[in-house]
C-alpha cells in the first residue's frame, strides 16, 4: 500500500466519510492511474439511491474545484461524471446541466509542472467534451442507451460465468473488462492520458543508455587523442624549421656581432709620430706590466706614456681577487730624474726638439725643468747665444729654456771669498760663465761658407753637466739673503772667528757682534739735561729735535737762553 492510500484512509476515518464518499474519493484519487471500471460501476448503481446520490454528487463537485498540483482530481472527477451521465441515474445528467457553468470554467484550467509541461491541457479537452455532450440532447440519449445495453450484456456474461464456475470471486481480468461501450471508451481515454504523461516524463538511464554513453565517451576520447597527436607533430615540424633557419642565419649573426664588437672595442693606439715635433716614445725602454685582458672581451689597451717623465702606471688587473702588485718607488714630479736602469735608453722629452738624429748626453731629457742641450745651427751661427746672465741658452722655436736653469748656473758661478771657507760676498757681481766677444766672427764664417757652397762646419754640442735641484735654484741670486738653515733649525752660537761683509754697516767693515744701529729706523733722540727739561713746558716728542722757547723782547724776568747742545751724529749710511 502506498503512502497516498494510507493518508487517504486516515482522512476518511477522521472526516467520517460515508461508503459512497469513500468510493468517490478513491476513484478520483491523485494516483497516476485511472479509476477502475468496477469501482465506477458500483458508484453508478449507488446513484439510484437518493441519499447516496447526494453524497456522490457533492464529492464530485468538491473534486472539480481543486487546482494546481491536484489536477488529477479534476480530470478523474470529470471522467467519473461522464460515466455516471451515461450509465447512472437520469438525475445525474439533470444536475450536471443545472451546474454546467462549473464545467465550462474548466476550459481555462492552467497548470505547468516543474518540468515545464502543461498538464492542464487534458483537463481543458475533457471539459470541452463534457459540455458538448450535455448540450446535445440527442447524442446524450443515444450514448445513454448504448451504455445501458453494454452494461446489461456484461452483467449477463458475468452471471453465466459465475454460475458455471461457482460462487467464487470473479477474476481480475473479468473485473478489468469494460462492462459497456461507454466504460470502455473512458478506460481508453484514461489510458491515452496516462501514456502521454509517461512519455513526457524524462526517461531513466538503463543499461543500454549506459553502454551508449560509454561508447560516446570512448569515441570522443579517441578523437581528442588524434587531434593531440596531430598538434604535437605540427609543433615538432615547426621546431625543426626554426632550428634549421637558426643554423642558416648563424653565420650572418656572427658577423653582425663581430661588427658590433669592433664598434665598442678600444681605439687603436696613438701614432708613434708626435704631430708637434716631439720624438716617438720608446715603449721598449719602459718596463711595463703585462696587459690584462678586458673582462668584457675587448683587446688589451697599452698603457700611455707619461708626458712628464713619470713611470708608466701599472694597468689594473682583470681579476678582482688577485693581490695587488707592489707599488714602485714614488717619483717626485718636481725633483730630479732618477737614473735609468741598465739597458734602458734615455726617455725623450715630449716638449723637446723634433730632431731625433742628434745624440743627447747628460741627464734624461724627460725632465721638463732641465735646460735643453745646445744644438747645431744649420746656418752656421754660434752654437750658443749670449744671455743676459752669461749662460749658454739653446736657440730654436720648438724648445723653451728652463727659467730656473740659468739661476742654477749663476749659483755655481758665484765667486767665494778667500778669507774663510764659509764667507760669501752678498753683493758680488755675476760672473759670466761664457761670454762671447763683441767681435766674434763665427757667424760671418758660416755665412761665407754658405755663399761659397761648402757646408758650414757642424758645431760640437756642449755637454751640460747634471744639476741638483736645491731651494737655491728657485731663489736665484737672492738665496744668500735667506738663511734656510735658521728657518728649519734652531740657531747656534756664532763662532768668534766668523765674519760677514754687510754692505749696510757704516764703512762696510766686518761685524764682530750683533748690530746696535738699525739703518732703517730713525736716530734715537738726544738726551736732555735737567735744565732743558725744567725750561721746556711741553715734554719732547720721541724722535723729534728739542724745542726751545725764546722771549720775543728779551724780558728782564726770564733767564738768559741756554746755548743749544751739540747735534746728534748722523749714522745713516745713505745720507752724505
Swiss-Prot record:
Domain topic, free-text comment: The NPF repeat domain is involved in EPS15 binding. The DPW repeat domain is involved in AP2A2 and clathrin binding.
Keyword Iron: no
Entry-linked Gene3D superfamilies: 1.25.40.90
A matching Pfam family: ENTH
Organism lineage string: Eukaryota, Metazoa, Chordata, Craniata, Vertebrata
Species of the source: Homo sapiens
CDD domains: ENTH_Epsin
Principal localisation: cytoplasm
Residue ranges constituting the UIM domain according to the UniProt record: 183-202, 208-227, 233-252
Positions of the UniProt region annotated as Disordered: 149-185, 265-404, 448-576
Keywords: Cell membrane, Coated pit, Cytoplasm, Endocytosis, Lipid-binding, Membrane, Methylation, Nucleus, Phosphoprotein, Repeat, Ubl conjugation
One GO term (biological process): in utero embryonic development
Compositionally biased intervals (Low complexity): 157-167, 265-296, 332-368
ENTH domain boundaries: 12-144
Effect annotated for changing residue 404 to A: Reduces interaction with AP2B1
Binding site for a 1,2-diacyl-sn-glycero-3-phospho-(1D-myo-inositol-4,5-bisphosphate): 8, 11, 25, 30, 63, 73
Protein name: Epsin-1
Subunit structure: Monomer. Binds clathrin, ZBTB16/ZNF145 and ITSN1. Binds ubiquitinated proteins. Binds AP2A1 and AP2A2. Interacts with RALBP1 in a complex also containing NUMB and TFAP2A during interphase and mitosis. Interacts with AP2B1. Interacts with UBQLN2. Interacts with REPS2; the interaction is direct. Interacts with EPS15; the interaction is direct. Interacts with ENTREP1.
Short sequence motif [DE]-X(1,2)-F-X-X-[FL]-X-X-X-R motif: positions: 402-411
Molecular function per GO: clathrin binding; molecular sequestering activity; phospholipid binding
Family statement: Belongs to the epsin family.
One Gene Ontology term, aspect cellular component: clathrin vesicle coat
Residues found modified as Phosphoserine: 382, 419-420, 435, 447, 454, 473
Amino acid at each position: 500500500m502506498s503512502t497516498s492510500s494510507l493518508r487517504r484512509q486516515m482522512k476518511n476515518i477522521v472526516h467520517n466519510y460515508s461508503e459512497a464518499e469513500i468510493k468517490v474519493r478513491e476513484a478520483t484519487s491523485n494516483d497516476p492511474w485511472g479509476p477502475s471500471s468496477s469501482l465506477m460501476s458500483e458508484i453508478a448503481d449507488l446513484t439510484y439511491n437518493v441519499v447516496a446520490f447526494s453524497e456522490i454528487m457533492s464529492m464530485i463537485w468538491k473534486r472539480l474545484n481543486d487546482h494546481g498540483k491536484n489536477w488529477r482530481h479534476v480530470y478523474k472527477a470529470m471522467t467519473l461524471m461522464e460515466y455516471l451521465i451515461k450509465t447512472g441515474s437520469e438525475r445525474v445528467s439533470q444536475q450536471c446541466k443545472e451546474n454546467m457553468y462549473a464545467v465550462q470554467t474548466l476550459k481555462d484550467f492552467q497548470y505547468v509542472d516543474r518540468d515545464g509541461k502543461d498538464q492542464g491541457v487534458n483537463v481543458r479537452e475533457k471539459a470541452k467534451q463534457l459540455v458538448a455532450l450535455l448540450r446535445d440532447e440527442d447524442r446524450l440519449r443515444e450514448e445513454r442507451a448504448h451504455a445501458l445495453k453494454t452494461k446489461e450484456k456484461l452483467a449477463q456474461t458475468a452471471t453465466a460465468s459465475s454460475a458455471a464456475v461457482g460462487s467464487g470471486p470473479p477474476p481480475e481480468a473479468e473485473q478489468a473488462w469494460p462492462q459497456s461501450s461507454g466504460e470502455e471508451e473512458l478506460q481508453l481515454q484514461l489510458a491515452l492520458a496516462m501514456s502521454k504523461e509517461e512519455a513526457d516524463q524524462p526517461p531513466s538511464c538503463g543499461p543500454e543508455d549506459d553502454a551508449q554513453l560509454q561508447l560516446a565517451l570512448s569515441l570522443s576520447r579517441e578523437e581528442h587523442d588524434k587531434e593531440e597527436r596531430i598538434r604535437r607533430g605540427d609543433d615538432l615540424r615547426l621546431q625543426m624549421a626554426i632550428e634549421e633557419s637558426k643554423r642558416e642565419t648563424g653565420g650572418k649573426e656572427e658577423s653582425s656581432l663581430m661588427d658590433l664588437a669592433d664598434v665598442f672595442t678600444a681605439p687603436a693606439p696613438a701614432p708613434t709620430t708626435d704631430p708637434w715635433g716631439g720624438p716617438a716614445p720608446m715603449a721598449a725602454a719602459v718596463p711595463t706590466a703585462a696587459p690584462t685582458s678586458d673582462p668584457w672581451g675587448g683587446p688589451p689597451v697599452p698603457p700611455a706614456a707619461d708626458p712628464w717623465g713619470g713611470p708608466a702606471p701599472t694597468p689594473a688587473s682583470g681579476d678582482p681577487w688577485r693581490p695587488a702588485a707592489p707599488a714602485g718607488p714614488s717619483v717626485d714630479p718636481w725633483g730630479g730624474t732618477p737614473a735609468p736602469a741598465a739597458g734602458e735608453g734615455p726617455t725623450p722629452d715630449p716638449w723637446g726638439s723634433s730632431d731625433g738624429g742628434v745624440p743627447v748626453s747628460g741627464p734624461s731629457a724627460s725632465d721638463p725643468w732641465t735646460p735643453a742641450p745646445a744644438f747645431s745651427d744649420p746656418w752656421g751661427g754660434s752654437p750658443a747665444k749670449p744671455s743676459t746672465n752669461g749662460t749658454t741658452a739653446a736657440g730654436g722655436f720648438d724648445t723653451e729654456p728652463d727659467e730656473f736653469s740659468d739661476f742654477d748656473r749663476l749659483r755655481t758661478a758665484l765667486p767665494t771669498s778667500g778669507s774663510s771657507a764659509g764667507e760669501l760676498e752678498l753683493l758680488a757681481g755675476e760672473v759670466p760663465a761664457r761670454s762671447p766677444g763683441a767681435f766674434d766672427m763665427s757667424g760671418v764664417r758660416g755665412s761665407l761658407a754658405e755663399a761659397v757652397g761648402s757646408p758650414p762646419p757642424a758645431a760640437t754640442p756642449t755637454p751640460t753637466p747634471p744639476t741638483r735641484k736645491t731651494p737655491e735654484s728657485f731663489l736665484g741670486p737672492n738665496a744668500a739673503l735667506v738663511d734656510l738653515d735658521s728657518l728649519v733649525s734652531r740657531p747656534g752660537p756664532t763662532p768668534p772667528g766668523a765674519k760677514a761683509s754687510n754692505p749696510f754697516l757704516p764703512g762696510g767693515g766686518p761685524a764682530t757682534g750683533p748690530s746696535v744701529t738699525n739703518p732703517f729706523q730713525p736716530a734715537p733722540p738726544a738726551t736732555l739735561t735737567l735744565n732743558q727739561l725744567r725750561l721746556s713746558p711741553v715734554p719732547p716728542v720721541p724722535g723729534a729735535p728739542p724745542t726751545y722757547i725764546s722771549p720775543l723782547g728779551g724780558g728782564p724776568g726770564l733767564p738768559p737762553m741756554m746755548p743749544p747742545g751739540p747735534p746728534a751724529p748722523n749714522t745713516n749710511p745713505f745720507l752724505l
